[in-house]
């Protein structure tokens, strides 16, 4: 009896010693891992240089994006076919940025940090070649093809370009008016070089678990088939929207063929994503999440309306108000400046608000309210509208509303998805951003040209629609006055204003439809941390081993 009792006591003490040893090892291991992660953190001068490099990268990307909005109609001085092939290419090649979801596996490769430098270097030098092109089509083709690769890789880290919009609008306008629009591309050479050096020297990203360790394994993870289907799918859609009712009739065989190909390719792409499961660019488990579906709908609406405003309001300033590109950019600072300020305020409120206030939901509702009112006021623009009303009354309100809601889909993805799915969810939202902008820019362009051509064909002074379209927005008043006389100017400007209001009407519809996404968004605590993966119970394992 005594012997069995002593054996039990010895066994119990040995179990306790083993459990304590296991816990000590686990705690020491966790401490070592924490110390290792802390030692790898970038500090001091390296951190400052890396921050400057990434900031310059955002500046360069914003400059290229803004150049398509403000400088487009000054390019007509060099390229008279801007409303033809050049305009199609600008909307047509935008979906090539849909490479972004397929490039998500690049972040799981152990060499992902230096890999982001190569697109920047190639992109900078090819942008320089754009300035040497003698045809606008070649310039646009090179610019958008290679900017698609650069945006696809660079947006994996700095996904929001809002901080770069304010200085870029003024810088781009000054380049265009005072020097040449080619400086919008030349400036990428020195600034892009600083970014490439900073990232290449100082960024050392750890390889995530489950990531590809070899280049061959990385290629196998890329969704090449889905990407090859997605590109022509959206090209067919945009061509149909671009041609229908303007270049060709809606019942033309070209437009019908594009719509048929779009439908077939869409079914094929969805089938490929279903068959690939989690290995595809669009994992179904992410789309099934309620907040992600709402974020997709919200992003589609917000970016569709924002791209139309950013594109067509500068056109309205240059054509209807007869201002220079520089002054147009300064006027639009009311929108971009308030957008940046609102984004910072909204992000701060979400991160510092009380746990039960669910600030992210209210920021999205603020967007719907403010942008719906602002787009309604913008729709009322006419040749007699004062510049002060445009700046303070409408653009500030629109920018504040857009800035307060633009980041919320990303915050929703970070809140409702697991840590391993955040990159996929964010990439999906960025894909919807570019798709929304591309699709609704094509829709608004179709409405604009159709309305403008219809109004000019019934013009009493015999104004040719082709002449107005080829002239562009910059210098429209002087061109019409020189060819058709002073009496035709006001009528042409009124027709131009009426056609632009069709685009602003699309913004009103998109802004109001985001209320559906507001209702579908879950009320989640955005400050709640992610639940870590459950580690094996050392105490339980030790007992099992002893038994």
Curated annotation (Swiss-Prot):
Location relative to the cell: Cell membrane
Primary localization: membrane
Transmembrane segments: 47-67, 156-176, 183-203, 224-244, 252-272, 296-316, 330-350, 360-382, 392-412, 422-442, 503-523
Topology of this chain in the membrane: Multi-pass membrane protein
InterPro entries xref list: MFS_trans_sf
Keyword terms, alphabetized: Cell membrane, Membrane, Transmembrane, Transmembrane helix, Transport
Chain segments carrying region Disordered: 1-33
Annotated disulfide bonds: none
Biased composition (Polar residues): 1-17
Source superkingdom: Eukaryota
An MF annotation (GO) of this entry: transmembrane transporter activity
GO cellular-component term (any): plasma membrane
Family to which this protein belongs: Belongs to the major facilitator superfamily. TCR/Tet family.
PANTHER family: MAJOR FACILITATOR SUPERFAMILY (PTHR23501), MFS EFFLUX TRANSPORTER INPD-RELATED (PTHR23501:SF199)
Purpose: MFS-type transporer; part of the gene cluster that mediates the biosynthesis of varicidin A, an antifungal natural product containing a cis-octahydrodecalin core.
Name of protein: Varicidin biosynthesis cluster MFS-type transporer
């Amino acid at each position: 009896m005594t012997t069995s009792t002593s054996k039990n006591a010895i066994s119990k003490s040995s179990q306790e010693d083993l459990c304590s040893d296991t816990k000590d090892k686990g705690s020491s291991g966790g401490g070592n891992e924490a110390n290792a992660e802390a030692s790898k953190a970038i500090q001091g001068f390296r951190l400052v240089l890396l921050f400057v490099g990434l900031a310059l990268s955002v500046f360069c990307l914003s400059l290229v994006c803004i150049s398509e909005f403000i400088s487009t109609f000054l390019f007509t001085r060099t390229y008279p076919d801007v409303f033809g092939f050049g305009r199609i290419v600008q909307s047509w090649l935008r979906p090539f940025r849909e490479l972004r979801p397929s490039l998500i596996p690049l972040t799981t490769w152990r060499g992902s940090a230096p890999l982001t430098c190569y697109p920047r270097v190639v992109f900078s030098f090819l942008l320089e070649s754009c300035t040497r092109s003698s045809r606008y089509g070649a310039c646009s083709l090179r610019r958008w093809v290679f900017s698609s690769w650069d945006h696809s890789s660079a947006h994996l880290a700095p996904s929001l370009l809002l901080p770069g919009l304010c200085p870029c609008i003024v810088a781009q306008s000054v380049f265009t008016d005072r020097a040449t629009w080619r400086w919008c591309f030349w400036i990428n050479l020195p600034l892009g070089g600083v970014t490439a050096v900073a990232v290449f020297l100082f960024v050392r990203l750890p390889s995530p678990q489950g990531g590809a360790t070899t280049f061959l394994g990385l290629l196998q993870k890329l969704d090449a088939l889905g990407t090859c289907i997605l590109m022509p799918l959206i090209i067919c859609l945009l061509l149909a929207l671009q041609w229908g009712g303007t270049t060709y009739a809606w019942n033309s065989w070209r437009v019908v063929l594009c719509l048929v190909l779009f439908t077939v390719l869409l079914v094929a792409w969805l089938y490929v994503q279903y068959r690939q499961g989690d290995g595809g660019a669009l994992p179904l488990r992410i789309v099934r999440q309620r907040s992600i579906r709402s974020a997709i709908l919200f992003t589609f609406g917000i970016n569709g309306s924002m791209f139309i405003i950013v594109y067509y309001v500068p056109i309205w300033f240059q054509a209807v108000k007869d201002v220079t590109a520089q002054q147009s950019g300064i006027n639009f600072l009311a929108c971009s400046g308030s957008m940046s300020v609102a984004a910072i305020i909204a992000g701060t409120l979400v991160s510092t608000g009380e746990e039960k206030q669910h600030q992210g939901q209210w920021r999205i509702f603020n967007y719907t309210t403010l942008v719906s009112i602002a787009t309604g006021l913008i729709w009322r623009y006419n040749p007699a509208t004062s510049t002060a009303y445009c700046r303070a009354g409408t653009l500030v309100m629109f920018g504040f509303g857009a800035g307060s809601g633009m980041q919320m889909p990303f915050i929703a993805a970070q809140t409702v998805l697991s840590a391993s799915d955040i990159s996929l969810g964010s990439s999906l939202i960025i894909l919807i951003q570019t798709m929304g902008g591309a699709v609704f820019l094509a829709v608004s362009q179709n409405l604009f040209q159709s309305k403008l051509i219809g109004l000019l064909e019934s013009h009493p002074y015999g104004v040719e629609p082709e002449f107005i379209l080829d002239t562009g927005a910059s210098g429209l008043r002087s061109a019409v006055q020189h060819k058709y006389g002073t009496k035709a100017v006001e009528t042409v400007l009124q027709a131009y204003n009426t056609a632009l209001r069709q685009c602003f009407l699309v913004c009103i519809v998109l802004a109001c439809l985001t209320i559906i996404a507001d209702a579908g968004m879950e009320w989640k605590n955005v400050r709640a941390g992610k639940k870590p993966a459950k580690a094996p119970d050392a105490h339980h394992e030790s007992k099992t081993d002893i038994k």
